[in-house]
């Protein structure tokens, strides 16, 4: 395997070629840093968290593909993944996971002790998540915790504590993550039913759209509460109204439960997250 091919394999294994997951992980993390700092976060902390998000998203993808390597070959969307297709060995993939995990932990060691403790919990959650798809119909709810764990870490890094507003933001991101990852699971629902993978898309059944809507409403409420507890104003409120618009559009996309529109609805959440972050940051400027 030449260097170019190896880079291609590694980038697909870590999803560097598909940054949507990294972005969905990044927006709430940046929101947490801005809220914790009351505006512009400490530059060192900001850089560490941006790099950390990229690395930990890569780690999560590796361990997910390792756990699903015998199943991914049976799913149309995932059968070409490097571990499923045999382009990379499990040993090499796990070695890359360890290297990246140590790099992320090295970054955390530049921060305070509370962040270090929270990071240990975060890496454990990251390792556990892929295996929940075999034992529970609600892996998306566990993913919501994993995907939101950077929020208390961001507050701890910036302020040395995790106040109530952090947990409002945590709850908002948890509800939002379950909603958009259920849309994502709707894409694979037929394949997952055949091979025994569990998901909220299967659990919710014919009520999937309605329950996703309830989670979107709950996310909105918690985003409002997080902003209220931090004394945010009109600009952030406009961002929340835009979030409602995105959520409505996503409901229209998933109405027919077809694969392509459901995936488009999932991708649309990146723009929702971007608008929330930008509106929050702008709220501190105006």
Curated annotation (Swiss-Prot):
Source domain of life: Bacteria
Membrane topology, record value: Multi-pass membrane protein
GO BP: any one term: ubiquinone biosynthetic process
Catalytic activity: all-trans-octaprenyl diphosphate + 4-hydroxybenzoate = 4-hydroxy-3-(all-trans-octaprenyl)benzoate + diphosphate
Keyword terms, alphabetized: Cell inner membrane, Cell membrane, Magnesium, Membrane, Transferase, Transmembrane, Transmembrane helix, Ubiquinone biosynthesis
EC number: 2.5.1.39
UniProt-listed Pfam families: UbiA
GO function terms (MF aspect): 4-hydroxybenzoate polyprenyltransferase activity
Location relative to the cell: Cell inner membrane
Known cofactor(s): Mg(2+)
A GO term from the CC aspect: plasma membrane
Pathway: Cofactor biosynthesis; ubiquinone biosynthesis
Residue spans crossing the bilayer: 20-40, 43-63, 96-116, 142-162, 167-187, 210-230, 235-255, 266-286
The keyword Membrane is annotated on this UniProt entry: yes
UniProt similarity note: Belongs to the UbiA prenyltransferase family.
Function statement: Catalyzes the prenylation of para-hydroxybenzoate (PHB) with an all-trans polyprenyl group. Mediates the second step in the final reaction sequence of ubiquinone-8 (UQ-8) biosynthesis, which is the condensation of the polyisoprenoid side chain with PHB, generating the first membrane-bound Q intermediate 3-octaprenyl-4-hydroxybenzoate.
Name of the protein in question: 4-hydroxybenzoate octaprenyltransferase
Annotated organism of origin: Shewanella oneidensis (strain ATCC 700550 / JCM 31522 / CIP 106686 / LMG 19005 / NCIMB 14063 / MR-1)
């Amino acid at each position: 395997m030449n260097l170019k091919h190896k880079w291609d394999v590694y980038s697909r294994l870590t999803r560097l070629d598909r940054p949507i997951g990294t972005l969905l992980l990044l927006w709430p993390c940046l929101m947490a840093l801005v809220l914790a700092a009351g505006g512009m976060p400490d530059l060192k902390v900001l850089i560490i968290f941006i790099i950390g998000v990229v690395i930990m998203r890569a780690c999560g993808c590796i361990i997910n593909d390792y756990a699903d390597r015998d199943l991914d070959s049976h799913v149309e969307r995932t059968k070409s993944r490097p571990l499923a297709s045999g382009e990379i060995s499990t040993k090499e993939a796990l070695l890359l996971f360890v290297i990246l995990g140590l790099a992320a932990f090295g970054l955390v060691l530049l921060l305070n002790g509370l962040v270090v403790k929270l990071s240990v919990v975060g890496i454990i959650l990251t390792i556990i998540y892929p295996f929940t798809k075999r034992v529970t119909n609600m892996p998306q709810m566990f993913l919501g915790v994993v995907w939101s764990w950077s929020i208390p870490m961001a507050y701890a890094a910036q302020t040395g504590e995790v106040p109530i507003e952090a947990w409002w933001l945590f709850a908002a991101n948890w509800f939002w993550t379950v909603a958009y990852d259920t849309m994502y699971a709707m894409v694979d629902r037929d394949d997952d039913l055949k091979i025994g993978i569990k998901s909220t898309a299967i659990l919710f059944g014919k009520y999937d759209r309605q329950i996703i809507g309830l989670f979107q409403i709950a996310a909105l409420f918690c985003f409002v509460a997080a902003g209220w507890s931090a004394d945010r104003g009109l600009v952030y409120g406009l961002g929340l109204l835009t979030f409602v618009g995105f959520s409505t559009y996503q409901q229209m996309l998933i109405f027919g439960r077809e694969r392509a529109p459901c995936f488009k609805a999932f991708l649309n959440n990146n723009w929702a997250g971007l608008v929330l972050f930008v509106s929050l940051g702008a709220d501190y400027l105006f």
